[in-house]
A protein has these predicted regions:
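N-terminal Rossmann-like FAD-binding beta1-loop-alpha1 element of flavoenzymes
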Residues: 3-31
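Conserved Rossmann-like nucleotide-cofactor binding loop
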Residues: 13, 37, 331
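Glycine-rich FAD pyrophosphate-binding loop
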Residues: 22-47
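Mid-domain catalytic core of redox enzymes
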Residues: 24, 265, 289-431, 435, ...
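Dinucleotide-binding Rossmann-like beta1-alpha1 core, especially the glycine-rich loop
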Residues: 48-175, 227, 231
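Active-site/ligand-binding neighborhood in enzyme catalytic cores
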Residues: 143-145, 152-155, 159-160, 164-299, ...
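Conserved mid-domain beta->alpha element of the FAD-binding
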Residues: 179, 322, 326-333, 428-437, ...
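C-terminal lid/capping helical subdomain adjacent to the catalytic/cofactor pocket in oxidative enzymes
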Residues: 450, 460-462, 471-543
Length: 543
């Protein structure tokens, strides 16, 4: 009888696990996805032909295994995209590509099929990965500042010479007398950037993102998001960029926050995961959308089955399984396991916290960026803009045209942006009506001098619960849960929410790949999965 793996969630980790199982084992994957969307937080949401990337997903990794997976699903572009020539993008065009396909379910063998073909033209074909310039800046007091920050002449001029001098002295003081205890995020940032720069740029924004004080957030979040970056390193990389243009070599050595180019699907991250889902289904895997895992049954120390509820009808089915991959929030998983784990595990799980997220999409005739000392600008080239102003609630702005021109239905005549708000379920923004949120977004882009409300042609709202696992609450005792998970040999917690870790999608994929490695090898020790993304060097563990 064929072995079965139930996979909770059709996001990057869940779909990668299903694809790997079909490619390398005789295990039948059954993905249970409560929504109608594919990709989880990496889905692409479509509103009137305009596409939203929820939170922004750059396809960048130092794992060759992950990169090969991506480029075998969506191959590199072989000709310029719609805006490459107009904006002078420096793009490395491919000539020939190799695509990989799972063999159809009816095939006599399950080998991966490879296809060599000319590299696609994004103006003529859809299945293509674009190479895009990375530009993210901080917008503060109607000035743009580089992200990550480095003290350059331009930055010094915009901050003011006195403020720059005080920032420099503060940084030198932090280097000479670093805080010994880096348990929490405030000390982590101060030791790398100095107190004055921390208070100017990091403190308010970070508390806007998480809704709690930096002194209450564990430093692991900072370590994962800035990857060994410091003010000194930012300055060194800025100088080095003037002397080198070798993209491929420099990217491998570079901290995540400093990458200069990245890969991106023509129609956003959801296109990648819809492609993977199509292959999974074609090879015989199941993806049950509109169904939710509501119970996990243990027997003899292993997962024996899961209870699945069909959301439309309420019908509940018990699905027996040999393996269970969970990408659901750990708090939910622990609460539904029968028999229940120890009170210590349940207590830690109940205390885990999450930050929720909503995006307000605005379709504009044009931008109207009021930068000090410049005439109003109708466009800027940023992918993301970090909004530091304390007087508005928006945290970031995405300009979707700059991720891929094809995200905007009419990229030549409109600008499609997303205002990102970090919220909690039940707070005023989360409960606000969509029409009121669109009006708030219109007011705020005008207030910060980024666009005019009169230029807004359309708007929409997209909510994403449990988007970011938080490094406060009971997180300091998370090892209690990890030890419990690893004691169940056929339970694999993978992905961002599955591990309660702020992973990028490549890290989430690696955890799924490594879990399947264990199944192939007959290994029941999954401790290696929990080392992915712990290193200060980005992604080296999976290379």
């Amino acid at each position: 009888m064929k072995r079965v793996a139930v996979i909770a969630g059709a996001g990057p980790a869940g779909l990668t696990a299903a694809w790997e199982l079909l490619a390398r084992t005789d295990v039948h994957p059954v993905i249970i996805e409560p929504t109608a969307a594919i990709g989880g937080i990496a889905q692409t949401y479509v509103h009137n032909g305009n596409r939203i990337d929820i939170g922004g997903h750059r396809f960048f990794t130092k794992s060759e295994r992950v990169m090969n997976f991506w480029l075998s699903m969506l191959p590199r572009q072989g000709a310029p995209a719609a805006d490459d020539v107009a904006f002078g993008h420096d793009v490395e065009l491919a000539t020939e590509v190799v695509l990989r396909h799972l063999a159809p379910e009816a095939a006599a063998d399950r080998r991966i099929r490879e296809e060599r073909r000319p590299a696609p033209d994004p103006e003529r074909e859809d299945r293509v990965m674009l190479q895009r310039p990375r530009l993210s800046r901080i917008y503060f007091s109607r000035h743009f500042f580089p992200y990550p920050l480095g003290i350059t002449l331009m930055v010094a001029w915009r901050l003011g010479l006195l403020n720059t001098a005080l920032i420099t002295l503060s940084y030198l003081w932090a280097k000479a007398f670093p805080r010994r205890d880096e348990t929490f995020l405030d000390a982590f940032f101060i030791n790398r950037f100095g107190r004055r720069l921390y208070e100017t740029f990091f403190h308010g924004y970070t508390e806007k993102v998480w809704g709690v004080k930096c002194s209450e957030i564990r430093a692991e979040w900072g370590a994962q998001r800035v990857k060994g970056l410091s003010l000194k390193r930012a300055v060194i990389h800025a100088i080095h960029d003037l002397l080198s243009s070798d993209f491929s070599k420099e990217q491998h050595r570079r901290e995540t926050s400093l990458i200069t180019r990245f890969w991106y699907p023509k129609y956003g991250p959801g296109q990648m995961w819809e492609t993977v889902a199509e292959q999974v289904r074609g090879a015989g895997g199941e993806i049950r959308q509109g169904s939710r895992v509501v119970g996990v049954r243990l027997a003899n120390g292993r997962v024996a089955g899961v209870r699945v509820r069909e959301e439309a009808t309420g019908r509940v089915e018990d699905v027996a399984c040999d393996y269970f991959f969970s990408t659901m929030p750990v708090r939910e998983l622990v609460a539904m396991v029968e028999p229940a784990p120890s009170s210590a595990v349940r207590e830690v799980a109940a205390g885990l916290r999450y930050r929720d997220f909503l995006t307000v999409g605005l379709l504009l005739n044009r931008l109207h960026v009021l930068e000090k000392g410049r005439l109003p600008r109708a466009s800027v080239r940023d992918n993301w803009i970090y909004v530091q102003d304390a007087g508005v609630r928006v945290g970031r702005i995405q300009i979707f045209n700059n991720w891929s021109p094809y995200l905007a239905a009419d990229h030549e005549n409109t600008v499609w942006i997303g205002l990102e708000y970090f919220v909690g379920q039940g707070d005023d923004l989360w409960r606000m009506a969509d029409a009121d949120l669109v009006q708030l977004a219109k007011r705020e882009v005008e207030q910060i001098g980024f666009a005019r409300g009169a230029d807004v042609r359309d708007g929409c709202v997209l909510r994403m619960p449990n988007a970011y696992p938080a490094y406060f609450g009971s997180y300091e005792n998370f090892d209690e849960i990890r030890r419990w998970v690893t004691s169940i040999p056929n339970l694999f917690c993978v992905g961002r929410n599955g591990m309660h870790r702020y992973n990028n999608q490549d890290h989430s994929m690696l955890t799924a790949m490594m879990a399947v490695d264990n199944i192939v090898a007959g290994c029941e020790d999954d401790s290696a999965l929990w080392t992915v993304n712990l290193e200060m060097v980005y992604g080296e563990s999976g290379s």
